[in-house]
């Protein structure tokens, strides 16, 4: 886990419906939104407020700062465990802190959404902490992690234990409903790979891989969108998926 010095550099956003403060007894589900590389999160929170207000949900959005170890590094958080910092455990600390501050928000299990770099985080959090997720939405990660025991982390899970102290609990992962989403036009070349050379191809490969291992996975291809923009449509796709499991 990270030292206290590093932990003090992490912050999180919270949204609760206005009526939270008017109710004597609170019963709220939790949605965690993970930002992408540029840390832009405001638009996703804005779009998620409608979901939260309609369905009695709270929203938590962590902010993972770049440059903690190397000044020009903005990717470490996507790996969850990197350079001695466990970003997944820092997030769980944030969620525990939120539970203390906002009684009635159920934090034992929660929904998780992320696009791009955030999608990488969600993908790997699913494998590291499946017991904490009600359902998750993995949005167009360029470097996904597959359930491949013959390839090292982060593409596969062969040495997963070296990073997290335990192997992937596949039976627990199989209990989590998974949505994979990607823009129809997100087909820009991002490098040669047996999983595909663009994000559309890689998301199809990820769905196939998950399904082959018994993970309930749906793939949504968003018409008219490439990799940027479309925050409203991406959140709406996740909302449609999540409300099945409230």
Q: Where is each model-derived feature located?
A:
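Short beta-strand immediately N-terminal to the catalytic nucleophile in serine-hydrolase-like folds
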Residues: 112-114, 139
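The feature captures the conserved acid-bearing segment of alpha/beta-hydrolase catalytic domains
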Residues: 135, 142-213
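Serine-hydrolase catalytic machinery in alpha/beta-hydrolase-like enzymes
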Residues: 10, 20, 26-108
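Short beta-to-alpha linker loops that shape the active-site pocket of alpha/beta-hydrolase fold enzymes
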Residues: 63-67, 142, 225
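Short glycine-enriched nucleophile-adjacent loop
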Residues: 119-130
């Amino acid at each position: 886990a990270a030292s206290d010095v590093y932990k003090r550099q992490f912050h999180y956003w919270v949204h609760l419906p206005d009526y939270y403060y008017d109710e004597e007894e609170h019963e709220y589900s939790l949605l965690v939104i993970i930002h992408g590389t540029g840390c832009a999160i405001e638009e996703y929170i804005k779009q998620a407020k409608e979901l939260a207000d309609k369905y009695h949900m709270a929203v938590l959005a962590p902010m993972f700062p770049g440059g903690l170890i190397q000044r020009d590094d903005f990717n470490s958080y996507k790996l969850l465990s990197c350079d001695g910092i466990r970003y997944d455990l820092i997030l769980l600390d944030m969620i525990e802190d939120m539970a203390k501050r906002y009684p009635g928000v159920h934090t034992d299990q929660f929904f998780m959404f992320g696009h791009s770099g955030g999608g990488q985080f969600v993908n790997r959090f699913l494998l590291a902490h499946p017991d904490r997720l009600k359902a998750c939405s993995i949005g167009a990660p360029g470097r996904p992690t597959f359930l491949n025991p013959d390839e090292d982390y982060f593409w596969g899970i062969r040495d997963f234990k070296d990073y997290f102290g335990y192997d992937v609990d596949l039976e627990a992962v199989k209990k989590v409903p998974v949505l994979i989403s990607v823009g129809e036009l997100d087909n820009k070349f991002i490098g040669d790979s047996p999983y595909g050379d663009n994000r559309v191809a890689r998301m199809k490969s990820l769905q196939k891989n998950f399904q082959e291992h018994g993970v309930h996975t749906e793939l949504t291809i968003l018409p008219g969108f490439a990799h940027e923009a479309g925050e409203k449509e991406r959140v709406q796709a996740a909302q449609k998926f999540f409300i099945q499991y409230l």
